[in-house]
């Protein structure tokens, strides 16, 4: 079943894949990594002015990673804000997605956390570096194929 936003994107020739609706009735769309930045700008102009959250997860060991964006359209005089969930999947040796920091500034720490935990690179992010783990940490702790070290060294504990 195609939602309102999906129909609008089709009408304007923007390539995506409708993933239906979640349990709350929020429309979910899949966007290709190479199209994500331009579609993000279009969604912002269309009225999705609030990035509620960005997260990422590992779909399968050694394979597909997903970056998930929950966008909200907030306007004066509207009782129920319109929401959409966008999923961008990456796979292979080049795990990169265009950063949407320049569209929604609130993506800053959220994209950095996804990078730190799963190793997804966000192109054109101004400060893409580890945020939770030390810079010297090797690997991506939330990947399903991550092998935890035998020991942990407490560093810079204050």
Curated annotation (Swiss-Prot):
One of its GO terms (molecular function) is quinone binding. GO terms for cellular component: chloroplast thylakoid membrane. It catalyses: a plastoquinone + NADH + (n+1) H(+)(in) = a plastoquinol + NAD(+) + n H(+)(out); a plastoquinone + NADPH + (n+1) H(+)(in) = a plastoquinol + NADP(+) + n H(+)(out). One of its GO terms (biological process) is photosynthesis, light reaction. Its main location: plastid. Keywords: Chloroplast, Membrane, NAD, NADP, Plastid, Plastoquinone, Quinone, Thylakoid, Translocase, Transport. It is found in: Plastid, Chloroplast thylakoid membrane. It is a peripheral membrane protein. It is an enzyme of class 7 (translocase). NDH is composed of at least 16 different subunits, 5 of which are encoded in the nucleus. PANTHER family: NADH DEHYDROGENASE [UBIQUINONE] IRON-SULFUR PROTEIN 3, MITOCHONDRIAL (PTHR10884:SF14), NADH DEHYDROGENASE UBIQUINONE IRON-SULFUR PROTEIN 3 (PTHR10884). NDH shuttles electrons from NAD(P)H:plastoquinone, via FMN and iron-sulfur (Fe-S) centers, to quinones in the photosynthetic chain and possibly in a chloroplast respiratory chain. The immediate electron acceptor for the enzyme in this species is believed to be plastoquinone. Couples the redox reaction to proton translocation, and thus conserves the redox energy in a proton gradient. This is NAD(P)H-quinone oxidoreductase subunit J, chloroplastic. It comes from Lupinus luteus (European yellow lupine).
């Amino acid at each position: 079943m195609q939602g309102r936003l999906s129909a609008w994107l089709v009408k304007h020739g923007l390539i995506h894949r409708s993933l239906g609706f979640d349990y709350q009735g929020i429309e979910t769309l899949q966007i290709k990594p190479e199209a994500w930045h331009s579609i993000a700008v279009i969604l912002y102009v269309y009225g999705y002015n609030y990035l509620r959250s960005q997260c990422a997860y590992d779909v399968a060991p050694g394979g597909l990673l997903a970056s998930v964006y929950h966008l909200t359209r907030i306007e004066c005089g509207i009782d129920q804000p319109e929401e959409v969930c966008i999923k961008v999947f990456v796979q292979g040796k080049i795990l990169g997605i265009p950063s949407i920091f320049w569209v929604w500034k609130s993506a800053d720490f959220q994209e950095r956390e996804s990078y730190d935990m799963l190793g997804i690179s966000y192109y054109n992010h101004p400060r893409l570096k580890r945020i939770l783990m030390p810079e010297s940490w090797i690997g991506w702790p939330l990947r399903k194929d991550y092998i935890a070290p035998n020991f942990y060294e407490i560093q810079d504990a204050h």
